[in-house]
Each structure stands twice: as C-alpha cells, then as structure tokens.
Amino acid sequence: MKTALKVASASAALFASVAMTGCGSNSSNTDASASASSAASGSVSGKVEVYAAASLRNAGTELKEAFEKENPGVEITYSFEGSSKLVQKIEQGASPDLLITADTQNMDKAAKLDEFKDAKREVIATNKLVLVTAEGNPGKINSLDDLKNSEGVVAVCKVNVPCGTLADEELKKHHIELKNATTEGNVSEVTTKVTTGNADAGFIYTTDLAAAKKDGKNLGSVDLPDVPRNEYPAALTTKGSSSDAAKKFNEWLSSDEAQKILAKYDFESPQAN
C-alpha cells in the first residue's frame, strides 16, 4: 500500500512538473509573439518637438491629432513662428527634433548649422501668396496697382520672413512703394491685422485666407499669378535623427493621410507642381 502511494505521489509530481513547464513555454511564446507583433506594427513612443512655420498652425494641429491617434505612445509639441525666427532660435541653442520652414531659403540657412549635419530635407507642401482686403474693402483695393496710390494701411511680413520676401519681390517687380505699411513678424499677425480692421489690406497665404473665411471673416482677395509657389521643406536635427518617433513623424508627413489633411487647409502637394 505504501509502495502504491509512493508511485502515485511520484506520478503527480511528474505531471505537475510537466504542466508547469508547458505553461512556462506558452508564456514565453506569448511574450515573443507580442514582441514580434509590436515590432511588426512599427509602434514608437516618446516626445517630438517640432518647429514649424506660423502658416502651418491650423493644419499642424490636425496632423498632430491624427499621428498621435495612430501612435498613442507619441506626444507632438509645436512652436509656430516665422521661419527666420525659428532658425534664429536654433542658432542660439534651441534643439527641436524637426524643423519645417515656409521657404527653402531659411532651410538653407539651417542646413549650415551643426544641428543639421548630413540632414536630408523633404518638401511636404506648397503655398501661394495672395493680397487680401479687409471686409467691405475700405481701401478700394481691387488690384495690385491700386496700392501705388493707396493711403490705406497695408500689412506685410518682415522681409526676412518668407511671406515678406515674396511680397517685397512682387512690389519691387511692379515698382510699388507702400505709403502706409505696417510690418509684422509672421503671416498670422498680418492676417489678424486685416481681419480686425487694423489694416486695409495685407499679403498672406491662400491657406490663411481659407482659414479666415472658415472663421466667418469676409475678406476680399487679389490673385498674384506671377508669384511662385513657396515650398515647405522639413528636416530632422541630429537630435531628431536619433529618435524613432521623430523619424516616423517626419516620414508620415509625406503619406497620403497627411497630405489629405494638408489639402483640407488649402496646401498643395509638392507632386502637384
């Protein structure tokens, strides 16, 4: 009887050992499968600091929301300002992960900095300068030539900011010297001047005009057909190049999903030009 009990006990112990080994094996396989699945999905995490041109503010907010929804472990933070101001901040020691300017000239300046050593740039969108007039067109400005004799306030960006560079070139081309100009730091500030009635007209982008109209602002506009479209290049800093989250966001900006979001705000795809 004792012998039988010993055999039974040994059998039970052996069965428990095999069962535990089996469970351990399944757990390991499950963990391995989860890791493989995570790697395959390309999931990333971390914070991504983006310096972006002021004209990207509205579109940029939706881009952030869409990317973070697909990548819940990522947090995108923005600084929106004039492109020249963003480059200046980096020159003075700021260290974002990604820079998006509203022209190639300011990106060229950034490319000379150590923070962008060996950086590759990718144009993610294009935009177009337009002359807008305040509601009711108090300055009676219906063409670019009307600015020659206008006494009204005309808002323009600083000349070292992309929207200011384009406006300055266009005015010089048509031999126009503004009699009553107000100079602003970026295109958003110019738009505000016009929408609040503190300027009779201003040079902004078609994207800013579209946003103002969506907000119920009844601005008039004058097309500037001979002004070239300006490009929006994006480039990772050396800091961003070592971040999987920053690299993935930078690549995603050229995806169909991101391009559809940009198109909603009147940006055009670089492939369309």
Predicted regions and their residues:
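Short beta-strand-centered segments that line the small-molecule binding cleft or hinge
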Residues: 87, 93, 97-103, 107-113, ...
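Short, high-confidence coil segments that cap the C-terminus of an alpha-helix
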Residues: 73, 95-96, 199
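Exported/periplasmic ABC-transporter solute-binding proteins
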Residues: 24-65, 69, 84, 88, ...
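Early exported N-terminus immediately downstream of N-terminal targeting peptides
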Residues: 128-130
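Bacterial N-terminal signal peptides that target proteins for export
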Residues: 1-11
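C-terminal motif of bacterial Sec signal peptides marking the signal peptidase cleavage site
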Residues: 18-22
